[in-house]
């Protein structure tokens, strides 16, 4: 709606994950490198954790785009599944044909093992990426551990990347999942963007959208955006999108503190408020 007004070819602050807009902060780059390292070195498991909206899914999709034809990839986003559903989904993602009537756990594992052995013989690497892994049941997590038992004498046949919110770490330390937890040797916990990175992030997205044209963000606006969003990319997108819409309706091309405050009021302070103490701090910034 406002893109043409600001000389942009598209909305730079969409909430949908878009690899073209990937902003690699130092931490995001480290997380991506951890996944690549785990795959190349055949570590078996990689765990990437981080808060909601921090960019985990975008990094996941970017990883897939970086992998070449020597890597066979299965990607799972729906994690409200049973252990049998998991196996069926993995097999489907790899494009393995299953004979009707043979949909049992044993058959699924046998078929998958045959595929992985052929894949290994062809010099290829099989990767299973599971996003939103914090939603997996204990039974499914145990089944994932069992998949890592598929191996040759020298290496694991499948490399598994678990991506999830911080509570996944709390789940993995439970006694029932001790064996799985001990197998995960490559881990990275994503943190929010710093204040300078928030500014770079916004400028990066405007550049990708073929901007900024006449659009300007003041230093005060950048500072307030960081304060309200706490460096979480999804919140930054939501706040900037609303700020640009307000600027468009007011026929102005500068995003300043006033515009940012109006955007926060429109979205609602509760969207940005994580705790009572932080909420008081944010409310103070909003009313001054």
Language model features: what each stretch is:
Residues 1-41, 281-288:
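A short, basic N-terminal segment
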Residues 11-13, 70-72, 84-100:
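Conserved NTP-binding/hydrolysis module of P-loop NTPases
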Residues 41-63, 79:
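Walker A/P-loop nucleotide-binding motif
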Residues 62-66, 168-183, 192:
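Short regulatory helix/loop adjacent to the ATP-binding pocket of P-loop NTPases
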Residues 76-80, 171-172, 185-198:
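Conserved AAA+ ATPase "SRH/arginine-finger" region at the nucleotide-binding site
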Residues 82-85, 97-143, 152-156, 194-198, ...:
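Mid-core helix/loop region of P-loop NTP-binding domains shared across ATPases and GTPases
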Residues 92-95, 166-167, 175, 193-212:
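Conserved AAA+ ATPase "sensor/coupling" helix adjacent to the nucleotide-binding pocket
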């Amino acid at each position: 709606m406002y893109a043409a007004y600001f000389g942009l070819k598209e909305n730079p602050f969409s909430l949908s994950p878009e690899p073209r807009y990937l902003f690699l902060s130092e931490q995001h780059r480290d997380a991506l490198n951890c996944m690549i390292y785990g795959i190349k070195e055949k570590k078996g498991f990689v765990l990437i954790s981080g808060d909601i909206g921090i960019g985990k899914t975008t990094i996941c999709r970017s990883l897939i785009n970086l992998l070449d034809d020597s890597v066979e990839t299965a990607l799972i986003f729906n994690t409200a599944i049973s252990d049998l559903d998991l196996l069926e989904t993995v097999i489907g993602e790899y494009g393995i044909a299953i004979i009707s009537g043979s949909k049992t756990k044993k058959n699924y594992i046998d078929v998958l093992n045959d595929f992985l052995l052929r894949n290994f013989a062809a010099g290829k690497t099989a990767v299973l990426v599971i996003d939103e892994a914090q939603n997996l049941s204990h039974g499914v997590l145990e089944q994932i551990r069992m998949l890592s038992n598929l191996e040759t004498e020298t290496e694991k046949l499948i490399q598994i990347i678990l991506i999830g919110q911080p509570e996944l770490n709390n789940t993995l330390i439970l006694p029932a999942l001790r064996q799985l937890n001990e197998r995960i040797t490559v881990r990275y916990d994503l943190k929010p963007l710093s204040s300078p990175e928030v500014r770079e992030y916004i400028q990066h997205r405007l550049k990708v959208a073929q901007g900024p044209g006449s659009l300007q963000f003041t230093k005060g606006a950048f500072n307030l955006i960081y304060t309200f969003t706490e460096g979480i990319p999804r919140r930054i997108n939501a706040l900037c999108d609303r700020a640009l819409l307000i600027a468009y309706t007011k026929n102005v091309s500068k995003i300043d503190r006033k515009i940012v405050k109006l955007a926060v009021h429109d979205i609602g302070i509760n969207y940005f408020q994580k705790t009572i103490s932080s909420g008081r701090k944010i409310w103070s910034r909003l009313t001054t």
